[in-house]
Amino acid sequence: MPWIQLKLNTTGTNAEELSDALVETGAVSVTFQDTHDTPVFEPLPGETRLWGDTDVIGLFDAETDMKEVVAILEHHPLLGAGFAHKIEQLEDKDWEREWMDNFHPMRFGERLWICPSWRDVPDENAVNVMLDPGLAFGTGTHPTTSLCLQWLDGLDLNGKTVIDFGCGSGILAIAALKLGAAKAIGIDIDPQAIQASRDNAERNGVSERLELYLPKDQPEAMKADVVVANILAGPLRELAPLISVLPVESGLLGLSGILASQAESVCEAYTELFTLDPVVEKEEWCRITGRKK
């Protein structure tokens, strides 16, 4: 069904309070948007870090009397009579279908294709990973995922064990298995990611070779020939002592989810135990790889 959107501008400090006000007047959802497209990276767990100048956007049912909503909001101490706002009618769309229509097969490296499960593969002789990531997890379109997939495609993974630290949709672990790895282990803090990875592994016929764990359940003394972690620079630095022990001696490490400007600080956290390769950049992101000393 169609919706009505009400947008108002405020400071990051007041955004949460105005979000509550919109919900109280009938908004079915509220989102925050940066007015000036200023990036904010790595909020702490449980933290909603907002921009200094923030648009607060409420979504209302199409039958909502928006004049009444505005009249109520005018009594809010942060707004007042005649407060600046924009009301817009949104056309009805099947958002999931629109997203599916825009997700096409993509090639990474020489052998690997990531293909939506609802599309035909472009090359039946290639290494094809059939992916149904849902709306929340990786599809290969982000530069960091692409960097990791290209790295895996260039490795000889035959008979190897691979750990995907922060597995999301399972795209990296499953790609490793399809590229010849004997076993892959996926770890993620989100139970939905574990389920998405499990579903995608079954779709690709590799579920018997993929182990999936929440951090609290992962076995002690886990080791792998190859470890890949596509998360964020902050966690990569903080978890360096944990991640660094996962590769076997002379094992390989691949890290991404890192802005190019953050590469040096991440390298510093791993250089003691790894011989690092030159950093590879794509757009504003980068990949760090190395071998265990």
UniProtKB/Swiss-Prot annotation:
Disulfide bonds: none annotated. It is found in: Cytoplasm. Pfam families: PrmA. Its main location: cytoplasm. Keywords: Cytoplasm, Methyltransferase, S-adenosyl-L-methionine, Transferase. One of its GO terms (cellular component) is cytosol. GO terms for biological process: methylation. It comes from the Bacteria. The keyword Kinase does not apply. One of its GO terms (molecular function) is protein-lysine N-methyltransferase activity. S-adenosyl-L-methionine binds at T145, G166, D188, N230. The keyword S-adenosyl-L-methionine applies. It catalyses: L-lysyl-[protein] + 3 S-adenosyl-L-methionine = N(6),N(6),N(6)-trimethyl-L-lysyl-[protein] + 3 S-adenosyl-L-homocysteine + 3 H(+). Its EC number is 2.1.1.-. Methylates ribosomal protein L11. Belongs to the methyltransferase superfamily. PrmA family. This is Ribosomal protein L11 methyltransferase.
